[in-house]
């Protein structure tokens, strides 16, 4: 999976250029930096709302696709991604005789979607208002209103797809409590946490028809025989856990997929909220784009491809 995401990321930040009529941008900040700040704001919200890694990946995907589909008109040689994915209606196109600020349109599309798929909207709306005010001071009213309207049109096409991806139906499923049968998953002490997104396999996919397209070797069968592969692998993990270096512990914590980590100290238990693995991939995308000095359209494409790949 990491190799696949790296390939997608590299594809998303390689070359292109030419232009639709683009209005003035915010003084003192590049269009690409606006997109980076938008994604970072979404990451902070995902942490605050404690979304699981699968749900976080869905949030990033829809919001980042909306952003890209709006800003790609800044460079017409960039093609639509949604028309290459499953279940999306055709995207609207801007009036070629009118001026737009496509970064503003992308921001509007991004946060229209973000508000549909997250909970804690106060901080999001506050940030969005600040960004809108900065754009309003940089472009005329007609360009501002036209760009906002275009971003909203893009978002509405994304909304039509996200309400039909089976996510809402999976919210009504009973908790997965596991099984007491040997070798089956069940909640374990000390926290007895629920199983995570056990119905995720019923979600409508973006690209693959079936997971069979990417065959994965079956894990070793459960066995309590000390000579079995299953037993040996578990012992190996246990033995290594006793000799971990501080660096190895930091790496493990960094990629830990639990956004709500329970900590235990004697009789005291407390929880820490933290970034999901998907959030790390979005952060890595930001680093790659900044290091390669990717422009705004290339940056939006990289975020969208990475998020869909998750």
For each feature predicted by the language model, list its residue ranges.
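C-terminal motif of bacterial Sec signal peptides marking the signal peptidase cleavage site
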Residues: 14-17
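Sec-dependent signal peptide recognition
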Residues: 2-8
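Acidic/polar surface patches and capping/hinge elements
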Residues: 19-310
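Generic cytosolic/nucleocytoplasmic N-terminal low-complexity/intrinsically disordered segments
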Residues: 1-2, 20
